């Protein structure tokens, strides 16, 4: 794999600067909001109000470095590494279950423990799946329209990945990867009746997955009527609503939120947008949503104008992943969707998510340098 890190102003202009600006701005904003949302809790738990800020700052620097590396690698080179990368990620997903290697938290086994850092392989697996599908869809071309060659093999792969993720109690990542895969197949020309049939067949299984597992069933019931159990299953979403209500139109002011003071669970991770809503108001939330929308729209433009099918599928998969995660997170914190445990890209606290997200943006930026009409 050829790497070239020499950058000049003329070369930078070849990248989609809107995508680059949105990614960097959201990341910087995320570092600020992680500190605001976590400082009180960090002071009590670690006797250091800057604990999460320092870690998120390091993750942001590493993520930006990963993005720069990905920007400088010709995206077409990922084609030959797609299969080994996917196999490597499958191995990492399985290592999570080995005692002494894997780590668990709140009943979920999703991490591989390293000194000072926990790696979440599911974040890597999302990009690995996109790379592999882009490579495979490019290779199959018209064969993707047939069930035996263009649909069934991907469903087998998806079933294996989702089974591992469900064993890790990571339904959010499983649904996200499933959604990305289905949309990539649809964009590639898979017959809609195959997709519709698969969705219909999956619904009973999904119902069983949710209603047969106590904590998932309670989440659905809390989603339908959080006030029925406001001190337990409905507590988190009610506190989130209170945060948005306190913020109003213009917010209480940066750092002035009250719900993060041990009222709102996961204030610096999954529910960080609630803190944004309380401190920066509806205006702040709209600005964040608009930035995500702009990033997604520019990403779709890159996909549509890519010079080759591999670049088109790769860009489409990445922008779909970012869009789904942002939409689901916003839906959860506002009560439009049941609680899923998905981070808000760029903004929520978390090393694996931030670094992998910025790396994916770097790939997208490289595709943007080789669109139709560019040399």
Curated annotation (Swiss-Prot):
Membrane spanning stretches: 17-37, 50-70, 82-102, 146-166, 170-190, 194-214, 234-254, 280-300, 313-333, 344-364
Subcellular localization(s) per the UniProt record: Cell inner membrane
InterPro entries for this protein: Cell_cycle_FtsW-rel_CS (IPR018365), FtsW (IPR013437), FtsW/RodA (IPR001182)
Highest rank taxon of the organism: Bacteria
Keywords carried by this UniProt record: Cell cycle, Cell division, Cell inner membrane, Cell membrane, Cell shape, Cell wall biogenesis/degradation, Glycosyltransferase, Membrane, Peptidoglycan synthesis, Transferase, Transmembrane, Transmembrane helix
One Gene Ontology cellular component: cell division site
Pathway the protein acts in: Cell wall biogenesis; peptidoglycan biosynthesis
Bilayer topology annotation: Multi-pass membrane protein
Protein role: Peptidoglycan polymerase that is essential for cell division.
Protein name (database record): Probable peptidoglycan glycosyltransferase FtsW
Organism: Geobacter metallireducens (strain ATCC 53774 / DSM 7210 / GS-15)
Taxonomy of the source species: Bacteria, Pseudomonadati, Thermodesulfobacteriota, Desulfuromonadia, Geobacterales
């Amino acid at each position: 794999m050829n790497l070239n890190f020499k950058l000049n102003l003329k070369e930078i202009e070849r990248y989609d600067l809107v995508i680059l600006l949105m990614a960097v701005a959201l990341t910087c904003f995320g570092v600020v909001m992680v500190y605001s949302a976590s400082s009180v809790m960090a002071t009590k738990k670690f006797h250091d109000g800057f604990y999460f800020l320092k870690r998120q700052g390091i993750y942001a620097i590493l993520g930006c470095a990963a993005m720069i590396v990905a920007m400088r690698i010709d995206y077409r080179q990922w084609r030959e590494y797609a299969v080994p990368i996917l196999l490597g990620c499958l191995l990492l997903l399985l290592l999570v279950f080995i005692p002494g290697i894997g780590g668990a938290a709140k009943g979920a086994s999703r991490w591989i423990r390293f000194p000072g850092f926990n790696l979440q392989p599911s974040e890597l697996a999302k990009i690995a799946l996109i790379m592999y599908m882009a490579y495979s869809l490019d290779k199959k071309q018209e064969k993707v329209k047939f069930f035996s060659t263009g649909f069934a093999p991907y469903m087998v792969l998806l079933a294996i990945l989702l089974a591992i993720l469900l064993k890790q109690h990571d339904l959010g990542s499983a649904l996200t990867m499933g959604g990305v895969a289905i949309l990539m197949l649809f964009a590639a020309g898979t017959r809609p009746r195959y997709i519709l049939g698969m969705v219909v067949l999956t619904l009973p299984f999904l119902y069983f997955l949710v209603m047969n597992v106590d904590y998932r069933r309670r989440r659905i019931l809390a989603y339908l009527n959080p006030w029925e159990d406001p001190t337990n299953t409905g507590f988190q979403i009610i506190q989130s609503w209170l945060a948005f209500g306190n913020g109003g139109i213009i917010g209480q002011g940066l750092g002035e939120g009250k719900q993060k003071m041990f009222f709102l669970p996961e204030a610096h991770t999954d529910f960080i947008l609630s803190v944004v809503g309380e401190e920066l108001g509806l205006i702040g939330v709209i600005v964040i949503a608009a930035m995500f929308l702009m990033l997604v729209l520019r990403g779709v433009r890159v996909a549509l104008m890519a010079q080759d099918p591999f670049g088109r599928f790769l860009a489409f998969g990445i922008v779909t992943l970012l869009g789904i995660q942002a939409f689901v997170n916003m839906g959860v914190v506002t009560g439009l969707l049941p609680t899923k445990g998905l981070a808000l890209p760029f903004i929520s606290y978390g090393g694996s998510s931030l670094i992998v997200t910025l790396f994916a943006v770097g790939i997208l930026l490289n595709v943007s340098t080789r669109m139709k009409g560019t040399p």
